Amino acid sequence: MTAGKLWGGRFRERTAGLVEEYTESVSYDRALYAQDIAGSKAHARMLARQGVISAGDAGRITEGLEQIRKEIESGEFVWRTEMEDVHMNIESRLTELVGDAGRRLHTGRSRNDQVALDFRLFVSDRIRVWKNLVRGVIAALTAQAHEHKDTLLPGCTHLQAAQPVSLAQHLLAYAWMLRRDYDRLEDCDRRVRICPLGAAALAGTTYPLDPQSVAAELDMYGVFNNSMDAVSDRDFALEAQFCGSLIMAHMSRLCEEIILWANPNFGYIFLPDAYATGSSIMPQKKNPDVAEIMRGKTGRVYGGLMSLLTTLKGLPMTYNRDLQEDKEPFIDTDRTVSASLEIMAGMVEALRFNTRRMENALRAGFLNATELADYLVGKGVPFRDAHHITGNAVALAEDRGKGLEDLTLEEFHSVSDLIGEDVFAVLDYRAAVERRCTHGGTGPASVAAQLAALQQWLSS
């Protein structure tokens, strides 16, 4: 027997040291210790209820597991590479503590369904953390939007000035992105939190197990349907990894705008000192490094998604050791997503906006051109003709170094006799925003409705 290996009965030679180092996972999957202990406690109690082990042994197992939890959390627990992973480390220590009872714990269970359970619980627990952190960013965006309902700035398409919008509308766009992320996480969790215990290695087990009671004890939504699928499925991790990637994509977009708006050529925001750094050579610099790093870390999370997709590609049924490579990318993603969400909430809350600069920027780029086209439509001009006439007016204003609102009535008449004195009220930027009365638009009533909906959701 290979010394120290819980599976070593049929082996006569020791595992090569380099192989142990190469194949171990305890250096990172120890992060799943709490889920492993919770799953083992539930399994032991179920075995006792089903008469597979005695109630006394189940009690000793749960007491031993609780002691191990305390040892781990106090830093006393010794993690051993030769034990390969978190599961074998804990079971080995359990046997040291409670003897034969510890050796009965694995009855009716394989590491295949054990690791599937632990990883599902871990991913689900982290999803619930992400949900709370997403709420924090939405709350920060909503609070800033509430403060800036009346602040206007250029809305852009193609990063070119397009139409005036409220700053609240702009910020709420990100709040709604993250609100969808929250819903995705909630939906994902229903598929993650499914109990695979009882699938054993791949074919089920001969013991009279009760997976439903284990699922209930662990607050899971249900049990597996097919034992082979249960031990080889990593859809749940892939889906959670995608949710994390999309959260980072949305925050990376917001980071990009923070970076742009902090540039003096925009000058829309005053970057908080707590979320900026300086230059080693240029004393005047105040760099948006936090937003840049978050934007960069988005690629790291995407890498985890591609890593898991590639790992799963072409795997035959059922469990394969390739699946050991599912956890490290997700653990890294969790650290990145969790930290990014927490930092983003603080950064958004600390932002100060240069509202005068934003409103002055409205005069560049003919943001009221659509208003002129709509005005002409109101005079009975077909929209395509109105579009053409407005284009001529823009060209005229551009040639004369004016905004549309600065043209004289005589100059307007050179492009259309239908334009009257009332056009000047139409070209006012604030009036343009106030006329956007459709559902979801930048008009005050719509913005107020969006704020109310998000505030109600946040308080629920």
UniProtKB/Swiss-Prot annotation:
Its EC number is 4.3.2.1. GO terms for cellular component: cytosol. GO terms for molecular function: argininosuccinate lyase activity. Pfam families: ASL_C2, Lyase_1. PROSITE patterns: FUMARATE_LYASES. GO terms for biological process: arginine biosynthetic process via ornithine; L-arginine biosynthetic process. Pathway: Amino-acid biosynthesis; L-arginine biosynthesis; L-arginine from L-ornithine and carbamoyl phosphate: step 3/3. Keywords: Amino-acid biosynthesis, Arginine biosynthesis, Cytoplasm, Lyase. InterPro entries: Arg_succ_lyase_C, Argininosuccinate_lyase, Fumarase/histidase_N, Fumarate_lyase_CS, Fumarate_lyase_fam, Fumarate_lyase_N, L-Aspartase-like. It catalyses: 2-(N(omega)-L-arginino)succinate = fumarate + L-arginine. Signal peptide: none annotated. It comes from the Bacteria. It is found in: Cytoplasm. The keyword Cytoplasm applies. Its main location: cytoplasm. HAMAP family: Arg_succ_lyase. Belongs to the lyase 1 family. Argininosuccinate lyase subfamily. This is Argininosuccinate lyase.
